[in-house]
Amino acid sequence: MKTLETQPLAPDCCPSDQDPAPAHPSPHASPMNKNADSELMPPPPERGDPPRLSPDPVAGSAVSQELREGDPVSLSTPLETEFGSPSELSPRIEEQELSENTSLPAEEANGSLSEEEANGPELGSGKAMEDTSGEPAAEDEGDTAWNYSFSQLPRFLSGSWSEFSTQPENFLKGCKWAPDGSCILTNSADNILRIYNLPPELYHEGEQVEYAEMVPVLRMVEGDTIYDYCWYSLMSSAQPDTSYVASSSRENPIHIWDAFTGELRASFRAYNHLDELTAAHSLCFSPDGSQLFCGFNRTVRVFSTARPGRDCEVRATFAKKQGQSGIISCIAFSPAQPLYACGSYGRSLGLYAWDDGSPLALLGGHQGGITHLCFHPDGNRFFSGARKDAELLCWDLRQSGYPLWSLGREVTTNQRIYFDLDPTGQFLVSGSTSGAVSVWDTDGPGNDGKPEPVLSFLPQKDCTNGVSLHPSLPLLATASGQRVFPEPTESGDEGEELGLPLLSTRHVHLECRLQLWWCGGAPDSSIPDDHQGEKGQGGTEGGVGELI
């Protein structure tokens, strides 16, 4: 059920028909060269020093035109991580009950860098992200305790809409805060990943400031439809070697992008039984950052982040007419147990041991293909959502035979509609195809044992497909938009409109935008309480939000 794929490699780690012409380096490119001697490369930045950045962030694509099609040139230098092989994990969890005392092994203390690591390549000057060395870090709360509060309508702060209006059929496909909260990553139908910095106005304590429209500091162009994307699990902007993003697109390898320069750092390639390149449908880094888990049809492939290329461990999820069938569409790791969950378009959920991928449980209950998974911080519960399915299901690993409870949301299309939990696990937030954002308090179950809705508001009139809660500030990010298929118009003598085409989208209100909402109290005068629910100051395109 588990095999190791170690086929002989060409010098460039891929067949000749997959190699594009070498790309011209970006002006901000790191001095990496595939044929360069590592001794000639400058040493990496000191671990304790934050990257020194330009006062003006770089706006615009940092990827050369040659990277837009085919497979960008991969780097021969492996990704530098501070983690070795995974430690020994706890014994396999018995059938459907998990021990509450089982936990992931503690990280081993980082030793001194080896000579090879000390002479490794420099990973970029860091001109994309803003320098926060003189400002309070996003993850450092200082003397202020920021907590999410949904007792009032969230206040709109800022957003981005002009960036996505250049193409008439463009729309957002989700957003994700970086693990350290310094920036946010978006995906859209134009096959571009964009990185936005945290609005600098948030650092003006004690001042009334106007929020300007957000502008991306990096654009990373993929060659085709992006299937999935994710941040490195231990990403920190203070350590450039941990600041990168993984993405997978149709008929392309898995790409690792530098979050400071927008350049390609490495590629991971998977091949089918015909030795043809196949794309991953889902991506997830392991909690310790040493492995990248990728979902394929009836298979999960595990790559080592220290060895880019095609070498990987293949873990079958379906064999001998048993197991989890279908494309593995989403993967999530438990924060407290040595296991991970997989959702498939075959409407099933599977639990697997982290160390060897052995199956622990197979669950079913959704009416459509699974599109998103999220674990509760306690590690005992996880949530699942599916396409064309009006239910969010909560599962308890200690009694995983059936859902603990379900919550209602409107999902009427095949689009991936995200949901998220705040860092404490108290609030569950979900988007919907109607545009409404719903909030539940998971710590306050109602009379029937399931959480009661706390708030529901309408940030815009189009589909809200992405929601993401900031890891340390009470900031909610929402992404909107959907693919619209023209509908046939009415014909006949009565009510016929002259000049109206046979196919029309006149009944659809298109709004493609990224928006940030303040969902907390106001310890200082920079975010006053008495402005809750007011129109944001990000421009005339800014949203107000309506209670439902």
From Swiss-Prot:
Modified-residue entries (Phosphoserine), positions: 26, 30, 54, 64, 85, 90, 112, 114, 491
Tissue: Expressed in all tissues and cell lines examined.
Expression triggers: (Microbial infection) Over-expressed following infection by Epstein-Barr virus.
Consequence the record notes for mutating residue 64 to A: Abolished phosphorylation by ATM and impaired ability to promote DNA repair
Keywords: Chaperone, Chromosome, Disease variant, DNA damage, DNA repair, Dyskeratosis congenita, Host-virus interaction, Nucleus, Phosphoprotein, Repeat, RNA-binding, Telomere, WD repeat
Outcome recorded upon mutating residue 398 to W: In DKCB3; disrupts telomerase localization to Cajal bodies resulting in misdirection of telomerase RNA to nucleoli
PROSITE patterns linked: WD_REPEATS_2, WD_REPEATS_REGION
Name of the molecule in the record: Telomerase Cajal body protein 1
Species of the source: Homo sapiens (Human)
